[in-house]
């Protein structure tokens, strides 16, 4: 059996980041969101999102009853740094790689649903993971944020340099 670990929303300007753990052959999965608070100024600089992602993966491993003899494929994104360390310490065999297939498809679909719960109408989906798809989603969401920047600030990844400048510029009289 193969376990896949992937993330969704790292480059999305609003919301937290989705983490999915999937058993490829059966489709069993665990999905949760690293909360938006982890991407605010102070917590983002401390990289607390790494611990948030690791916690979700650990819960997924318990839920799916992952065994040490299963192959594990984990996305290379930096949000998984602490998870990779945990996998090593726990004695799991794993490969860091680009994730595709069911984990990527299900994760992106669940993340789009999450964005809808934040109030974003019809967020563009990431299907092929192309630069154009990511750009289209980013600018669509930023147009939505610009409609009410102060009212939607709590949903933004304000730890990003982009938002430090964005909110500095929008607060000018």
List where the protein language model places each region:
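RNase H-like, Mg2+-dependent phosphodiesterase core
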Residues: 1-173
């Amino acid at each position: 059996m193969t376990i896949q670990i992937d993330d969704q929303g790292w480059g999305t300007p609003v919301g937290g980041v989705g983490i999915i753990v999937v058993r490829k052959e059966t489709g069993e999965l665990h999905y949760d969101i690293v909360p938006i608070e982890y991407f605010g100024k102070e917590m983002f600089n401390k990289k607390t999102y790494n611990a948030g992602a690791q916690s979700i993966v650990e819960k997924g491993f318990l839920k799916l009853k992952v065994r040490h003899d299963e192959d594990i494929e984990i996305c290379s994104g930096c949000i998984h740094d602490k998870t990779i360390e945990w996998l090593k310490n726990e004695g799991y065999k794993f490969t860091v790689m680009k994730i595709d297939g069911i984990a990527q498809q299900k994760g992106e679909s669940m993340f789009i649903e999450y964005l809808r719960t934040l109030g974003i109408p019809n967020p563009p989906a990431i299907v092929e993971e192309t630069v154009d798809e990511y750009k289209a989603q980013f600018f669509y969401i930023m147009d939505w944020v610009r409609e009410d920047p102060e009212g939607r600030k709590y949903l933004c990844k304000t730890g990003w340099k982009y938002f430090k400048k964005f909110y500095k510029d929008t607060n000018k009289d």
